[in-house]
Amino acid sequence: MHSILISGAAQGIGAAIAQLFYQQGYRVGIYDIHLAQAQQLADQLGERAHAGLLDVADYASWQTALSDFCQWAGELNILVNNAGILYSGAFENTPIEAHHRTMAVNVNGVLNGCHSALPYLKQASFARVINLSSASAIYGQADLISYSASKFAVRGITEGLDIEWQKYDIRVLDVMPLFVQTAMVKDMDAATIQNMGVHLSTE
């Protein structure tokens, strides 16, 4: 039975991914900084779902989560780096701490996940990494400067590792949707997104 670990899986896109792969018969790891919500989803899904605590910006947290998951699932076949945050508004009106936090979660979180998961992925019967990027990785976006920059970085990490990890037979892929109607974007202040409209949902 194949397995998948999803970061930021307690709600939104991560929860939708967890539900989809559970329906496909996978062992599903629902890891999130909000453990109670992750556990609630795991309980709803059933015995092939497992919840755990994960702060993606903390490398040690990744090491603990991966060890916990692989002890439960047996191996790691698919890693989904989904966790991400977004601050919207004029660049100069956004506190520098918010810009730094965006990069720590959205970029360092992916670096930490890929780096710490590699030993487990190399041992698996087959292995894939899926990084959640964004259409903002293709063009810079006003009012979303640090978010857009972080997704450019994720795109670069993905393309580079997909080439580099061919030697391990590990594919590294990304998904670059337009903005999806989730809690993360509900209160965002970005005129460009409002003009385009948000037409995707997790349903």
What are these regions (language model features)?
Residues 114, 150:
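Active-site helix of classical SDR
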Residues 139, 160-170:
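Active-site-adjacent segment of SDR/Rossmann-fold oxidoreductases
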Residues 174-175, 190, 194-203:
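C-terminal helical subdomain
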Residues 134:
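Residue(s) in the substrate-gating loop at a strand-loop-helix junction
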Residues 1-28:
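Canonical Rossmann dinucleotide-binding motif of NAD(H)/NADP(H)-dependent dehydrogenases/reductases
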Residues 90-91, 95-100:
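Substrate-binding pocket helix/loop in short-chain dehydrogenase/reductase
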Residues 35, 52-64, 96:
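The beta1-alpha1 cofactor-binding region of Rossmann-like NAD(H)/NADP(H)-dependent oxidoreductases
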